[in-house]
């Protein structure tokens, strides 16, 4: 089959230099170039398929590329298409090593057992963070004393040592061990190295910008007299937390002798104005190759920037656009910086019956340990005899209830209030019995408060914020990040009146997320990291605010990676791009992201008041009768009584018949 190539692609496919870096703009056809390069090597240069390896970063990408190569060029036999780890596994098997890869569940249990010594509850996020730090350390080529983990150094070292001890004792490997062993083997045994140098004459690497130090070391070892054909884009390097570095793209010609850079400049994916706007953003980065990027399409799509009052109105606007659109649900993607931001979108889509697909299928905001803790307090308020939730909260903050006493409560046979179990225990000191009784009364008191007041009472009066301070210090974690979870939880409860309503809402969200796992035709919800390499007709990039994107933890030394992340997000769009920057997030006023300003995105002002005035009485379909407190451009503030004040997009309410004036 004849494949049509543009001039940039032809130069990349047919060049005969030894070491080539193809710098590929988004949507520029890098997979087309790679499979055509392989075909050129086989048909024109008569290279044996056994002398070619094509390395990708995921098995799915490798399978897709192999399949396309075979189908496009009608081949029965293909060279190796696979990941670095897949290649290293094959090498070690060939050299006689017996390899058993450690199961993910076992890794989790090892780390959890270490972390459990420092905290009663160990979150999945914390386990993943430790395992990621272990991987980052092993691939960094640094000594242990030189490595700075993102958590407590003592906890990291203990976790690392226990993890390695278990693997060594049971003859197990992880993927990083495969990399380390192959490189060590090649360094120590020149005969084996030369064997593979003679075998791997042509090495092709996809997503070169994602290579870590160990992978670059391997490629350099394979490059003695062989050819390297690397394809990537430093502007899409968004995995520094895994050890990838854009510098390898920029300094390619210094690392690999005689290296030459070729640029794929035509974006075949996006409408012209989306390409032009994305260029305005990414040109502000310094760690990049200067390059020409241009759109193949001469058409302009819709680029809309909106600055709604808050995240709820943001969700309403997105819902209205999708509902009125002729596009299929699956052609829309809502993208965000962190998983937590999906919470408000899920709420809105659930209420408006818009089907969705969570790419991170296991994510539920209410599964975060902070949410579980606050919910445990509230459940205990509903049922003071609830032993499970009593055990969950009693030492958050630490209330000097020993592990033996916790076990005593857990195994107590009679159906008795857990507070009374400890208070009536003979060896419980009077002062502790008094404290337990006071805590019981405080928890029962939660039932008399409004939901928002009850949540705040748990955080402030019952000392949960003190527990979070201790947690942050112990695990070397940002207290601000933990407080963001608390504020998001408060936002989730906004509009609900009672503890029972909140508990029902949490169960409803859980059910909806479970249902979404079976949904085939739904709007895609994902972090920007999760959609790299994908494309959608319509992209909705939400919460484009300072301290969200760029994230507040990356405002200084990692600002270029944050800009790359924003760039990756907006370049997923084929037809239309919608960017939202709420004026408030979790009740706090926010500045519009600098990346929005760099891209020249501008909001269209909405000044229509639809004849509604302050103090008018209206009826909202969801909240009932209310009074207009204030109208400011498109934001209408309504008072529904009982202390419930809400802000909405006036245009959304009117256009969707959600609000009517009560005559």
Enumerate the language-model features and the residues they cover:
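C-terminal accessory regions
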Residues: 544-644, 648-650, 655-663
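Conserved helicase NTPase motor core
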Residues: 2-14, 18-22, 61, 80, ...
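A basic/glycine-biased coupling hinge at the interface between accessory DNA-binding modules
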Residues: 18-19, 25-28, 41-186, 190, ...
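Walker A/P-loop NTP-binding motif
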Residues: 32-47, 220
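Helicase P-loop NTPase motor core
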Residues: 26-34, 257-260, 265-356, 382-383, ...
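Conserved beta-strand position immediately N-terminal to the Walker
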Residues: 20-21, 52, 262, 332
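Conserved beta-strand -> loop -> alpha-helix junction used to position metal-binding or nucleic-acid-contacting
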Residues: 76-91, 354-376
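Conserved helicase C-terminal RecA-like lobe
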Residues: 377-589, 593-598
């Amino acid at each position: 089959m004849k494949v049509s190539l543009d001039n940039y692609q032809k130069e990349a496919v047919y060049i005969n230099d030894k070491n080539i870096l193809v710098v590929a703009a988004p949507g520029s056809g890098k997979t087309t170039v790679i499979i055509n390069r392989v075909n050129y090597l086989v048909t024109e240069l008569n290279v044996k398929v056994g002398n070619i390896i094509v390395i990708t970063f995921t098995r799915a990408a490798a399978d897709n590329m192999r399949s396309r190569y075979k189908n496009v060029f009608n081949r029965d036999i293909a060279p190796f298409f696979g990941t670095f780890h897949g290649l290293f596994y094959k090498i070690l098997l060939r050299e006689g090593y017996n390899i058993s890869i450690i199961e993910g569940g076992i890794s989790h249990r090892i780390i959890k057992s270490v972390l459990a010594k420092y905290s009663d509850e160990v979150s999945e996020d914390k386990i993943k963070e430790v395992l990621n730090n272990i991987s980052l350390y092993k691939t960094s080529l640094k000594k242990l004393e030189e490595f700075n983990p993102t958590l407590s150094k003592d906890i990291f070292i203990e976790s690392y040592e226990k993890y390695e001890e278990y693997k060594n004792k049971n003859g197990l490997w992880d993927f990083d061990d495969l990399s380390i062993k192959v490189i060590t083997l090649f360094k120590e045994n020149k005969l084996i190295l030369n064997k593979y140098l003679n075998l791997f004459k042509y090495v092709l690497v996809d997503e070169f910008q994602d290579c870590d130090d160990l992978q670059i070391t391997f490629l350099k070892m394979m490059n003695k007299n062989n050819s390297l054909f690397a394809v990537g884009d430093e502007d899409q390097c968004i995995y520094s937390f895994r050890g990838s570095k854009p510098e390898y793209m920029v300094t390619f010609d210094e690392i690999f002798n005689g290296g030459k850079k070729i640029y794929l400049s035509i974006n075949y994916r996006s409408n012209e104005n989306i390409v032009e706007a994305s260029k305005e953003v990414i040109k502000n980065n310094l760690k990049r190759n200067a390059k020409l990027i241009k759109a193949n399409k001469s058409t302009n799509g819709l680029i809309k920037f909106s600055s709604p009052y808050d995240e709820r109105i943001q969700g309403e606007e997105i819902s209205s656009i999708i509902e009125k659109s002729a596009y299929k649900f699956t052609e829309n993607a809502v993208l965000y910086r962190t998983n937590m931001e999906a919470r408000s979108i899920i709420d809105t889509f659930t209420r408006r019956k818009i089907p969705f697909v969570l790419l991170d299928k296991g994510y539920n905001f209410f599964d975060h340990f902070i949410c579980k803790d606050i919910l445990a307090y509230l459940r205990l308020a509903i049922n003071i005899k609830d032993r499970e939730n009593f055990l969950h909260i009693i030492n958050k903050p630490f209330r000097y209830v020993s592990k033996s006493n916790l076990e005593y409560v857990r195994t107590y046979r009679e159906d008795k209030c857990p507070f009374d179990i400890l208070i009536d225990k003979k060896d419980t000191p009077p002062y502790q019995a008094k404290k337990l009784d006071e805590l019981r009364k405080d928890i029962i008191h939660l039932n008399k408060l409004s939901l928002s007041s009850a949540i705040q009472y748990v955080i402030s009066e019952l000392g949960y914020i003190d527990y979070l301070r201790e947690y942050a210090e112990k695990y070397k974690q940002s207290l601000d990040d933990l407080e963001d979870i608390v504020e998001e939880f408060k936002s989730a409860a906004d509009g609900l009146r009672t503890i029972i309503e909140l508990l029902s809402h949490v169960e409803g969200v859980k059910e909806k997320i479970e249902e979404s796992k079976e949904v085939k035709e739904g709007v895609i919800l994902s972090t920007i990291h999760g959609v790299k390499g994908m494309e959608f007709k319509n992209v909705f990039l939400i919460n484009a605010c300072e301290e969200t994107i760029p994230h507040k933890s990356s405002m200084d030394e990692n600002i270029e990676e944050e800009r790359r992340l924003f760039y990756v997000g907006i370049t997923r769009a084929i037809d239309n791009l919608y960017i939202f920057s709420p004026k408030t997030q979790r009740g706090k006023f926010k500045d519009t992201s600098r990346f929005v300003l760099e891209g020249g995105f501008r909001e269209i002002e909405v000044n229509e008041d639809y004849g509604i005035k302050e103090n008018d009485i209206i009826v909202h379909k969801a909240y009932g009768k209310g009074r207009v407190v204030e109208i400011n451009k498109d934001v209408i503030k309504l008072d529904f009584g009982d202390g419930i004040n809400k802000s909405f997009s006036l245009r959304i309410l009117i256009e969707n018949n959600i609000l009517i004036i009560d005559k």
